[in-house]
Structure formats: C-alpha cells, structure tokens
C-alpha cells in the first residue's frame, strides 16, 4: 500500500488497487479520538475488497469532523430519496396536494350525463379504492344516475414511460418496482401505489386455496395452481407476476388452518387498474355507464363533477420516507417536471432535482441522478454531496417536517421509526438519530442527523458498495458512536459493539429495505 499526505490539505490518498481492506482517504478530524473510534468501525473485515465512504460534519456550520473517501462516487440506493424529497418540498411546498377529478363536457340533466365521463389523474400515489368510492358517491349525490358515453381514464399529467432508467427487469413483479402513472391505485395505507394484494386462504387438505385480490380488479389475472396441504405442513406458497404479463401465478402449498397469506404484486397498467376500480365504484352506487372503458385526454371544456385531494406533501413524506416508498419518489419527480415545464417526465423532473441540489451548493458535476427513488443502478452520489444537502436543508423553512419524516432510530412505532425502528434500540442513538436508509444487493447506506453527548448537532453519511456480507451493523455502530461522543472529556467515544447490535437487531433482508418485505 502506498500512502501520500499533502501538506496543504492533510488529505491521505491510498493506493486503491492494492489496499487489502476498504480504501482510506481522509482529512484530519477535529477530534483525533473520534477518528480512532470511526476508523475502528471501518476496520471490520466485511469491508475488505469493498468501497466505503463516511462523512461527518457539524450540522450548523458544515465543519468536517471526519472524512473517508468522501469524493468517491457510490450507488446510494434509497439515500437518493433525500434529494428527491428536499427538491419536492422546495418546489411544490409542504402544502401541495394532488388532485384527482371526475369531469364531463355535458351537464347533469334528469340524472343523465350525455357525454363521456373523464377520470383525470393528478399524480396522486395515495389514491385508495375508498377514495374512488368517494368520487362515485359524490357523483351520486350530484344526481348522476347514468352516463351516456364512455368512461375515459386520463393519465396524461405524466408521460407514458412506465419505469425509470436502469431498473432491473427481474424486480418488475415486486411492489417496490411498480409502474409510475398519474392515475393509479394504492391497496393499503402504506400507499403502495401501482400494486394489488393477493390474498390466499387455505381450503381443506388437497383442495385449491381461495385466492382474491384487494382491491377487487380485473387488471391482473390470477392463475391458481396452488393446493392446500395438511395442517401443520410447510408453507411453500409462491405468488409471482409473470414478466411482461398481467398473469399472476399462485403455486405451492398452504397448510390447512393457516392464516390468510398476503403478497403484494405490481400491476402492469395502473391506469387501467384505476379505471376498473372506479367503474366498480360507479356500479356499486347504481350509476350506469353505457359505453366502454378506455384511455384518453380530458377536453379543455370539461367541467368538474367530483374531486379528491390528497393529504398535504408534508404528510405524504411520512409514509414516503419512513417506509422508503419508491413509487412516491417517482411520482414526485414526474410532478416536479409537470409543474415546472408542463411535461411530467423523468427527464424534466430530475432536472429540477439537480437544479435544487446545485442551488444548495452540491457539485452536481460529480454525481449522477437517474431516478427519484434510488432503485436505478445508474445512480451515483458522494457522501460529500449528501452531507452538503443535509447541512443546507437545515436552513429551509420546511426543514422540521422533512426532519420529522426521516426514520428515527430505535422507535418501535412503525410510522415513527420506519426502517430504523428495529435498529440501535436502547442506545444513545435511540429517538435521537434521524436518518435515511438505503439497501440493494451489495449496497447499504445510512445518512442523517444525530446529536452527540454534548448536544452538538451532527450530520453524517455512510455509503458502502461491493461487499459480500452486509456491513449494515457498522452503520449502526457509527450512529451510536456519534451519539456517545463527547468533546468535553477529551476521551475517545466508546466504539459501539457491532456484534451486540447484530444480536439485538432484526435487520430484515440484507438486499432490500426491510419495509419492502413488510419486515418493519
């Protein structure tokens, strides 16, 4: 290993090709004891042959307190959501709401609408089946009994590109990789838009189980090849949507007497899904549509007959950030594009995200933003860039709502602790550290805010790539070490025992966010 130190900057540059462990390049920290403690964490053998970057700064001044490879570009996974959410709060505002309308070009006369009925999406990723039922009820209350025309689903607020750049094709069936549409349905109050829940109930041994969709829809086709096994037998049930198809295959065995099995699957055409759910709601209200269900644009002369507004953006941030919801991120990106340029595309929206980051001092020439959620393998950030954003965000008028929406370490409440609810429990970081997680195969990240033992507010970012065994517990060790650090006594902070953290923590799947597996 060759090492060079520049006298002017104190930068330590290590030959990356020959380093036996994670490469080292760092500036002198304000507290050598803190440097030693963090260096000990990063000496874990799981970092051997991997890439790891750590930045620690004062949250108010931006002063660098620890740096390791902070200019190294790495895939950030869901840490990308920090940039997307901050740009959305700045451009759209915390009070922004998404609106879904029902319109017609003809008035209601004698209970009839003698024109097409238009269901116009405004990009709301939180629309539930009950919200579509409410729209139908509004029409009923307005006297609508019959539509002499078609039901037209309008998703033109966004473009028709369904998936972002460099998303893995084999993720397509899984609900964290759903299609983005301006008109969609969420099947639950996690607001997993563009997905449906497949519920499988066991029958008697040897019989087929009962399979149902929530909400009920014809947007996907169930192929039930499963069987009911004997009571107490192994559950080998598998639910998977066929690639590039609307067919969902249910196979394997579910034991008799078992509880209902739930699996979330993506829907290939969320616009058709929304139209189907709304058409069912109309029928439930006794409203007849004489024509067909199709897709199209709403004429400018159409008048609003019913409307639904989403929660405010500041409220949406909670399920979005706590549960690391990819579809919320992509809906926000396309909304940024639509509001700024009239084109709801990734290209237009990501330009707004980059512009916000650049305005806040992030060098956007050395990073790459390819989507809003971090699911793209093309995304590249540095911990310098993340730390720059975290320091800048603290000065924003909307900061408190954004900060509160970040997962909080060790807090067991699902919509408080989020993806950190089972991490750093009963430590100095518990209910102290607010951070955004990130997880994909051979990618893990944690960035956010924590106060040390003296009450000094810190920002930190740790991103690791290309490891074989997950070093996620070392992120927790960093968070706890920072929370325990005191400058007053001059002693080294006690380095958190990552082995103890691993024993006491259920991290869930190593390759995805725990919320994506409904494990947190």
Give each language-model segment a name.
Residues 69-74, 264, 373-376:
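A short glycine/serine-rich beta->alpha loop
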Residues 54-56, 100-102, 447:
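Short beta-strand scaffold segments in enzyme catalytic cores
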Residues 42-68:
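A short, well-structured edge-of-sheet supersecondary motif
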Residues 65-67, 330-520:
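Small-residue-rich helix-loop
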Residues 62, 81-88, 151, 183, ...:
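Residue-level preference for non-acidic, small/hydrophobic
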Residues 20-30, 36, 40-42, 91-363, ...:
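Conserved serine DD-peptidase/penicillin-binding transpeptidase domain
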Residues 67-87, 92:
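Short active-site loop at a secondary-structure junction
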Residues 1-21:
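Secretory targeting and sorting signals
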């Amino acid at each position: 290993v060759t090492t060079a130190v520049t006298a002017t900057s104190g930068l330590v540059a290590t030959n990356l090709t020959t380093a036996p462990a994670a490469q080292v390049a760092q500036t002198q920290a304000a507290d050598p004891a803190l440097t030693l403690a963090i260096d000990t964490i990063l000496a874990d053998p799981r970092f051997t042959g991997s890439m790891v970057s750590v930045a620690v700064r004062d949250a108010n001044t931006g002063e660098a307190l620890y740096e390791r490879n902070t200019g190294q570009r790495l895939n950030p996974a869901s840490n990308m959501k920090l940039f997307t959410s901050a740009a959305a709060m700045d451009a759209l505002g915390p009070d922004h709401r998404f609106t879904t309308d029902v319109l017609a070009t003809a008035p209601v006369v004698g209970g009839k609408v003698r024109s097409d009925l238009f269901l116009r999406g405004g990009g709301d990723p939180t629309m539930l089946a009950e919200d579509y039922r409410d729209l139908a009820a509004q029409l009923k209350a307005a006297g609508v009994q019959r539509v002499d025309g078609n039901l037209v689903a309008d998703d033109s607020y966004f473009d028709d590109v369904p998936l972002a750049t460099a998303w893995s094709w084999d993720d397509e069936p899984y609900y964290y990789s759903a299609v983005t549409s301006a008109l969609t349905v969420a099947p639950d109050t996690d607001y997993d838009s563009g997905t449906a829940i497949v519920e499988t109930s066991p029958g008697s041994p040897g019989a087929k189980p009962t399979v149902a969709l929530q909400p009920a829809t014809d947007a996907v086709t169930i192929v039930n090849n499963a069987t009911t096994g004997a009571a107490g037998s192994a559950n080998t049930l598998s639910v998977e949507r066929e690639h590039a198809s609307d067919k969902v295959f249910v196979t394997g065995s579910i034991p008799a007497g078992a509880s209902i099995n739930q699996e979330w699957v993506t829907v290939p055409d969320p616009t058709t899904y929304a139209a189907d759910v709304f058409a069912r709601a109309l029928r439930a209200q006794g409203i007849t549509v004489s024509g067909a269900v199709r897709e199209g644009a709403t004429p400018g002369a159409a008048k609003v007959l019913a409307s639904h507004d989403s929660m405010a953006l500041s409220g949406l941030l909670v399920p979005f950030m706590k549960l690391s919801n990819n579809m919320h991120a992509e809906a926000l990106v396309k909304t940024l594009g639509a509001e700024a340029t009239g084109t709801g595309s990734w290209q237009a929206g990501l330009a707004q995200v980059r512009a916000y980051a650049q305005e806040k001092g992030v060098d956007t020439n050395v990073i790459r933003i390819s989507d809003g959620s971090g699911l793209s393998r093309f995304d590249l950030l540095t911990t310098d860039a993340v730390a720059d954003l975290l320091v800048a965000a603290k000065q924003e008028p909307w900061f408190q709502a954004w900060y509160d929406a970040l997962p909080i370490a060790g807090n067991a409440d699902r919509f408080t602790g989020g993806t950190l609810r089972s991490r750093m429990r009963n430590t100095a970081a518990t209910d102290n550290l607010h951070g955004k997680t990130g997880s994909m195969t051979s990618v893990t990240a944690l960035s956010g805010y924590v106060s040390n033992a003296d009450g000094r507010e810190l920002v930190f970012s740790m991103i690791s790539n290309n490891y074989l065994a997950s070093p996620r517990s070392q992120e927790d060790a960093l968070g706890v070490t920072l929370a325990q650090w005191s400058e007053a006594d001059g002693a080294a902070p006690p380095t958190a025992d990552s082995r103890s953290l691993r024993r006491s923590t259920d991290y869930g799947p190593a390759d995805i966010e725990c919320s994506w597996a409904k494990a947190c």
